[in-house]
Amino acid sequence: MFPGGKMNPRMMKQMQKMMKDFGMDSEDLKAVKVTIELEDKIMVFDKPKVQVMDMMGTKTYTISGRSKNTSKTAEKIEDTEVKVEVTEEDIEMVATQCNVSKEEAKTALEDVNGDLAEAILKLGN
């Protein structure tokens, strides 16, 4: 648009004044992260350059930078809670370590998704 890609500071001020006269205003935002959620994927921009332009009450956002794309199916897998099946061996170990009944040990293991150490700590308190 301009020779050498640079603009005279005086021209820049004139251009900004003209934009304001036409009801246009622009501002650079200090964004750290921008996330755009689409139907099939999520786009994440780290350290983007974000500019907002207000034209007669309508705001337009311009985002530039590199994005990382993540599919939504991967996100759904992470959100799904996995139920761990507690073995009889684990129940006996926790019951013996904490000197509690097998029923108490089984309940504690189910509460912490089969984590032996966490179940022992839970019953120890």
Curated annotation (Swiss-Prot):
Tell me the ranges covered by the NAC-A/B domain, including all copies: 9-76
The Gene Ontology biological process terms listed for this entry are: protein transport
Q: Which UniProt keywords apply?
A: Protein transport, RNA-binding, Transport
| Gene Ontology molecular function | RNA binding
The record's disulfide annotation reads none
Assembly and binders: Homodimer. Interacts with the ribosome. Binds ribosomal RNA.
The UniProt similarity line reads:
Belongs to the NAC-alpha family.
Protein function:
Contacts the emerging nascent chain on the ribosome.
Entry protein name: Nascent polypeptide-associated complex protein
Give the originating organism: Methanococcus vannielii (strain ATCC 35089 / DSM 1224 / JCM 13029 / OCM 148 / SB)
Source taxonomy? Archaea, Methanobacteriati, Methanobacteriota, Methanomada group, Methanococci
